[in-house]
From Swiss-Prot:
Stated name of the protein: Transcriptional activator MN1
Modified residues (Phosphoserine): S950, S954, S1007, S1081
Recorded disease: CEBALID syndrome: An autosomal dominant developmental disorder characterized by global developmental delay, intellectual disability with severe expressive language delay, craniofacial dysmorphism, and structural brain abnormalities. Most patients have an atypical form of rhombencephalosynapsis, a distinctive brain malformation characterized by partial or complete loss of the cerebellar vermis with fusion of the cerebellar hemispheres.
Compositional bias of kind Low complexity: 202-214, 291-309, 523-550, 564-578, 759-768, 798-809, 895-905, 973-984
Localisation per UniProt entry: Nucleus
Organism: Homo sapiens (Human)
Biased composition range(s): Basic residues: 98-113
Superkingdom of this protein's organism: Eukaryota
Functional summary from the UniProt entry: Transcriptional activator which specifically regulates expression of TBX22 in the posterior region of the developing palate. Required during later stages of palate development for growth and medial fusion of the palatal shelves. Promotes maturation and normal function of calvarial osteoblasts, including expression of the osteoclastogenic cytokine TNFSF11/RANKL. Necessary for normal development of the membranous bones of the skull. May play a role in tumor suppression.
Gene this protein is translated from: MN1
Quaternary structure, from the entry: Interacts with PBX1, PKNOX1, ZBTB24, E2F7, RING1.
GO biological process per UniProt: intramembranous ossification; negative regulation of osteoblast proliferation; positive regulation of vitamin D receptor signaling pathway; regulation of cell cycle G1/S phase transition; regulation of DNA-templated transcription
């Protein structure tokens, strides 16, 4: 937006990336404001990704995940810097800003935040620097008075506002600015999301930043960029994802510089407390003091940033700010506390007084509020987030914006923070990411260690009223319920690590929900409390730390809101169920927070669309919701963040989350820390099984929340998320058990996936992408992947949402999955419709993806979202989510094993590539036996592919694909496709692109990517595909797989397309296969495993089914000698042969990857099929299967899917298990690919085959992997997988099972991801 433009220079100054990101964000952000920012991960990350890329590929994941294992540091850090800064500016202009971005960014963020940040510029700009810049540039200058700002700002810069603002926010600020300093620059991105965590930190006073997270980061931040702290704790895992992207560059570059400058300031910031004098000195600032605390810090930050970009920023923002001032008033209205107005002209008056007060924690309530503990919160309310959502929002819903800001920010911040802590925004979101910000934020409050305490203020969240929210939410909502509820467990880990924040986040999540209702009262309370809170806030800051967690919860809640909102849109009932259980919903949101962070941005975007719906669901939050839609986007970015964060953060921690236990770090979060995962799982569970659905909102959003999760996760897919959530939401009922059970799977999927992705922290990049996906799906897969599971569940939805924000098509996918039970046909129809819708919307996704390309990670997230979306459908969707995660796994690993993800894509491209292929796919798919489905898959896929090409398009397509694949029997194909597509698109595109190759990454994201894929293998593949397609629906799938495998190997981006294509065909294949699968499922797996998997092994297994088809196809593809394998399966055989051609033909090197990809796809397909079978049978099962698929793909996810399916059916289990083993092996193979070539692959395959046939024997599977060169690791994974699969199988339906699976998945995922990373 204007801010953006303005910001851009600044950004440029700060960082080209930032600018890019910024404007991306602006565009995105501005667009959806949150969509992008929130979606940042998705959108900006794309653009930003470049910068982010540098920072962390998965901006989505907060690529910065990588710093944290995945997200947190990267994310949070980045986020902290970027996000935090963003959050800062987005958050509440000053608080967060200075907190995160002591410097320019901050300031502008701040100002906008405070000033009008939210009002107009911030809304759009808030997230965007543009807005923020505006806001805060103006805020600084325009804020109360530009001169003060300028001068103060300058002062700040000179004085190092941090100090200045240090005094302002003596306690908070210092921390805060420390954080702020660190974060300051980053604000540029869309703080909104991140603002949350950052906000929290900022808000909280950066202590948060400063605090544990902050502190850890602090050094890091200081070290890192200074922003790190903020970033980190911004943990924009989610938001960062989005803004984080923005900020990433900022952080990375701009921010770093700013950081450098800002950081210095921040250094001063903490030290800056001394700078207090500055504050005084900055009387002008002082005027901004209230602001200044934010503003000053901002100023200082801004100055720093602005120092660098001061002119631009300032002038830019000056004008903007001025506007913001106007906005500010609006904000002021909105948040009297906000003190934006205060900042605005009033501030001048207040300022001096305020200044002293500012310096004193108890400045005038308004000021203080804003400034002090609460101020952070206050600012937060006033933060652009509120505005960010939109000036109107701000205006119209001062409260809302405030609330939303609060929610969002808290979410973001929390999420970021938490996520960050969890490292997985998911972030983990479950992220991308994402945001466990909700949790983070909330959690952060709780997490003292999270010195997010300072951030807590960010909990402005609670105080729509402004600070009150801080107090209210923080105190009332968060602290009490959230904090206590989840915090406890979360906090335990929290203090120690970011991870703990993860738990915090999650734990907070559920409580957040409580607060949700509180929200409204809260608002009132907030106002009352605002003052109270100001005082309280300081207290609360600690509390706020807790609250931050709570805030995260709030964020989650918000995310969930966002998710729910979307779900609500789609599935109001579920939404409500999801939503309000708010609590749970919040949990979901929380989950969503993380995921929402990512998703939330989307959500916000979506929220914008869905805002109203969201509102409905979240009545109280509604204010936020409706208006916060944008905010949601923000928060959802938190979900996205969650995803990203979750994906990223969660991916790590969240990833760890489920297997928090698995992951030591997450373990603390473990229960809670699973933040996403755990929280998903735990918070999900923690909130109570009852909440589980809601909490499972993470689950819900996860499974039952598949949709929810999807939504959450769809942060990146954010859009899809809501849809998915909605769609999934419906499944929740279906999924109710399934959701619960499946959902758990989902949580697993999300968590597990995240975990897997998490496991891919190493695969961070990939994990970012893969992890993101992995976060949700890939967790380990990549930053994106972690979220993918998160997303994945809603990926489709998410994708859809992304693509078709409101498309609903995605919803359909979810619905489809919901239909899952219905006939395949129904699913197919739905899938078809979905696909179509996706087709329509995919462009959106595409755009995002395009943006995301750089943001591949984000894209992954989105892909994940797709996966999520796919996963959204419990079975199919979820599974696709699972698949996607698997892809992410491969994707993440693909990062490690780019080919895995990538291959996915390419194969699709061929199918898709042939424009007709799509049709053919359709036809094939139809032919496949699932005409409806295949068509859906095909059509969807085609669309999806395109989408995938875009990268985010993938979500739509992915979604479609996933939708179709997961949804329908085709879904399985799609699933594989999705997995591959997701993996490829997400993994391939995102991961492939991100992981596979930056270039491919982008390429993958872009059409070129799939074009490339096609070009790679696709060129050939299309024929294959055509043949395969023509040959058989199964073939279609297989060929795609093969193609995709081939392509994947060939190229990262290629796989994207291929994946799509693959998805299409596989969908059909699976579709067709699905029926057979059901019938011949048992056979399929064996054959798939034996013959399919081991192309050479031949069709003996004769799992001619789609699964086998896929398997065969995959094996064929990768086995090269697939011919023999697919003979077993007619369709498969055909596919296989072509695949074989593709696969075998591809270089051995590619071969392994290709195989992997093929396998993954195959597995996905199989899963899909298994799922499908169950899908028809049980949505839940499918969902779980989907998770399993994801897991399997991740190595774990698939297994999980298998398990779920297994429970459902031994065949499924076997298939899944085998697949998983296969997957693992394949995966590893790709990793091994280098290590092991085609021969190894074959060899591995053979063992696989054995394992697959013996899939029942976990050992066998295990052994099989062991056989692999990489087998050992895969074996482990497999083993775990298998075991878990068994577990899951036994308990697949049960949530416990899911958790187990999730843990397993996480563990495996982690391991797997790690392994992959290692291999890679």
């Amino acid at each position: 937006m204007f801010g953006l433009d303005q910001f851009e220079p600044q950004v440029n100054s700060r960082n080209a990336g930032q600018g890019e990101r910024n404007f991306n964000e602006t565009g995105l952000s501005m667009n959806t404001h949150f969509k992008a920012p929130a979606f940042h991960t998705g959108g900006p990350p794309g653009p930003v990704d470049p910068a982010m890329s540098a920072l962390g590929e998965p901006p989505i994941l907060g690529m910065n995940m990588e710093p944290y294992g995945f997200h947190a540091r990267g994310h949070s850090e980045l986020h902290a810097g970027g996000l935090q800064a963003q959050p800062v500016h987005g958050f509440f202009g000053g608080q967060q800003p200075h907190h995160g971005h002591p410097g320019s960014h901050h300031p502008h963020q701040h100002h906008p935040h405070f000033g009008g940040n939210f009002g107009g510029p911030d809304p759009g700009a808030s997230c965007l620097h543009g807005g923020r810049l505006l806001g805060y540039g103006g805020a600084a200058g325009g804020l109360g008075s530009q001169p003060p700002f300028a001068e103060g700002y300058e002062h700040m810069a000179e004085s190092q506002g941090p100090e200045s603002f240090g005094p302002q926010r003596p306690g908070n600020l210092p921390d805060f600015h420390s954080s702020g300093a660190s974060s300051h620059a980053v604000p540029a991105p869309c703080l909104p999301l991140d603002q949350s965590p950052n906000r929290a930190a900022s808000f909280h006073g950066l202590p948060s930043s400063s605090g544990s997270d902050s502190h850890s980061l602090e050094p890091r931040r200081v070290t890192n960029q200074g922003a790190v702290d903020s970033l980190e704790y911004n943990y924009p895992g989610e938001a960062p994802s989005g803004h984080f992207d923005m900020f990433s560059p900022s952080d990375s570059e701009g921010q770093l510089p700013h950081y450098a400058a800002g950081r210095q300031v921040p250094g001063g910031a903490f030290p800056g407390a001394s700078a207090m004098p500055r504050a005084a000195g900055m009387v002008g600032l002082s005027k901004m003091h209230a602001q200044p605390p934010q503003q000053q810090p901002q100023q200082q930050q801004q100055p720093q940033q602005q120092q660098q970009q001061h002119g631009v920023f300032f002038e830019r923002f000056s004008g903007a700010r001025k506007m913001p001032v106007g906005l500010e008033p609006s904000v002021g209205s909105r948040h009297p506390l906000m003190q934006p107005p205060q900042q605005a002209p009033p501030p001048p008056q207040q300022q001096p007084p305020q200044q002293p007060p500012q310096q004193q924690p108890p400045p005038p309530p308004g000021l203080l509020v804003r400034q002090n503990s609460c101020p952070p919160a206050l600012p937060r309310p006033q933060q652009g987030e509120a505005g960010t959502p939109s000036g109107g929002l701000q205006d119209g819903g001062p409260m809302l914006p405030s609330q939303h800001a609060q929610f969002e920010y808290p979410i973001h911040r929390l999420e970021n923070r938490s996520m960050h802590p969890y490292s997985e925004p998911v972030f983990s979101m479950q992220h991308p990411p994402p945001q466990q910000a909700p949790n983070q934020r909330l959690q952060h409050f709780d997490a003292p260690p999270y010195m997010n305490v300072a951030k807590r203020p960010r909990f402005d969240f609670p105080g729509s009223a402004g600070v009150d929210r801080c107090a209210s939410w923080n105190g009332s909502m968060h602290n009490g319920a959230l904090d206590n509820h989840l915090s406890p467990s979360a906090y335990p880990g929290l203090p120690g690590e970011f991870t703990p924040p993860v738990p915090d986040s999650f734990p907070s999540g559920p409580p957040l929900q409580h607060p949700a209702p509180d929200h409204q009262s809260l608002q009132q309370q907030q106002q009352q409390q605002q003052q109270q809170q100001q005082q309280q806030q300081q207290q609360q800051q600690q509390q706020q730390q807790q609250q931050q967690q709570q805030r995260q919860n709030a964020a989650l809640m918000i995310k969930q809101m966002a998710s729910r909102n979307q779900q609500q849109r789609l599935r109001q009932p579920n939404l409500a169920q999801l939503g309000h259980p708010g609590d749970v919903g919040q949990g979901g949101l929380v989950h969503g927070g993380p995921v929402g962070g990512l998703a939330q941005p989307n959500f916000e975007r979506e929220g914008g669309s869905t805002g109203a719906g969201r509102l409905g669901t979240f009545e109280q939050q509604a204010p936020h919701l409706a208006q916060e839609s944008a905010w949601f986007s923000g928060p959802h970015p938190p979900p996205g963040d969650l995803l990203p964060r979750r994906m990223g953060g969660s991916g790590l921690p969240a990833d760890c989350g489920p297997h928090d236990p698995s992951l030591a770090p997450p373990p603390p979060p473990g229960g809670s820390g699973v933040l996403f995962r755990g929280p998903l799982q735990e918070p999900m569970r923690m909130p109570g099984e009852g909440h589980v659905p809601a909490l499972p909102s993470p689950g819900l959003q996860f499974g039952g929340s598949l949709g929810g999760l999807g939504q959450l996760q769809s942060p990146g897919a954010g859009v899809g998320l809501p849809s998915a959530a909605s769609e999934r939401r419906p499944p929740p009922p279906d999924f109710a058990t399934s959701a619960l059970g499946g959902q758990p799977g989902f949580p697993f999927g999300a968590a597990g996936r995240q975990s897997t992705p998490h496991s891919g922290p190493g695969v961070n990049s990939p994990p970012s992408a893969g992890g993101g996906g992995g976060s949700s799906g890939g967790g380990g897969g990549g930053g994106a992947y972690p979220p993918q599971p998160d997303f994945q569940p809603s990926q489709r939805t998410s994708a859809s949402k992304l693509g078709a924000l409101s498309l609903g098509s995605f919803n359909k996918p979810s619905s489809k999955d919901n239909l899952f039970g219905q006939s395949c046909l129904a699913a197919l129809s739905t899938a078809c419709q979905n696909m179509i819708a996706s087709l329509g919307a995919p462009n959106l996704n595409v755009t995002f993806n395009k943006k995301n390309p750089p943001e591949g990670k984000r894209k992954l997230s989105q892909n994940e979202t797709d996966g999520a979306a796919v996963a959204g459908n419990p079975g199919s969707d979820y599974f696709p989510g699972g698949t996607a995660p698997g892809a992410p796994g491969p994707g993440g690993p693909s990062g490690t094993s780019s080919s895995g993800s990538k291959a996915s894509g390419p194969p699709n491209p061929p199918a898709q590539g042939d424009g007709t292929s799509l049709s053919p796919n359709y036809t094939l798919e139809s032919t496949s036996g699932n005409d409806g489905k295949p068509v859906s898959g095909g059509g969807g896929r085609g669309r999806g592919r395109r989408k995938r090409d875009s990268g985010h398009v993938s979500p739509g397509t992915f979604f479609d694909k996933y939708s179709a694949a997961p949804d329908s029997g085709g879904a399985p194909g799609v699933s594989p496709g999705q997995q591959q597509a997701s993996g490829a698109a997400v993994g391939g595109s995102s991961a492939g692109e991100t992981r596979g190759a930056p270039t491919p990454h982008e390429k993958a994201l872009t059409s070129p990517s799939w074009g490339k894929g096609a070009e790679l293998l696709l060129g050939d593949q299309p024929d294959l595909i055509g043949s395969l397609d023509g040959g058989a629906k199964s073939d279609s799938s297989s060929p795609n797989v093969g193609e995709f495998a081939s392509d994947e190997v060939s190229t990262s981006y290629a796989n994207e397309d291929e994946v799509s294509s693959s998805s299409d065909n596989p969908q059909a294949l699976v579709k067709a296969s699905r029926s057979p699968l059901v019938t011949g499922s048992p056979k399929l797996p064996p054959r798939g495993v034996g013959a399919g998997e081991h192309g050479p092994k031949a069709p003996p297994p004769a799992l001619g089914l789609g699964i086998m088809s896929n398997s065969t196809s995959t094996p064929d593809s990768y086995g090269g000698g697939g011919g023999p394998g697919h003979p077993g399966t007619p369709g498969l055989e055909q596919v296989r042969t072509p695949t074989s051609s593709s696969g075998a033909p591809p270089p051995d090197e590619i071969h392994p990857l290709e195989i992997l990809q093929a396998q993954i796809q195959l597995q996905r397909q199989q899963f899909s099929i298994s799922e499908d079978q169950p899908l028809g049978l049980k949505g839940g099962k499918k969902g779980e299967c989907a998770v399993g698929a994801s897991g399997a793909q991740n190595g774990d996810s698939e297994l999980g899917s298998c398990c779920s399916e297994a429970v459902k059916s031994a065949m499924s289990t076997i298939d899944l298990d085998s697949l998983m083993a296969e997957h693992s092996a394949a995966w590893y193979m790709p990793a091994d690919k280098a290590l092991v070539d085609s021969a190894d692959d074959d060899k591995t395959l053979a063992p696989w085959e054995k394992a697959k046939p013996q899939n029942p024997n976990s050992k066998e599977a295990h052994d099989l992997p062991a056989n692999k060169a990489s087998a050992s690791q895969p074996g482990s994974h497999l083993q775990c997988l298998s075991v878990h699969c068994t577990d899951d199988v036994g308990d697949a339906k049960a949530r416990a099972s899911v958790p187990t699976w999730r843990s397993l998945h996480s563990d495996i995922s982690n391991r797997f991801g790690t392994f992959v990373a290692a291999l890679t």
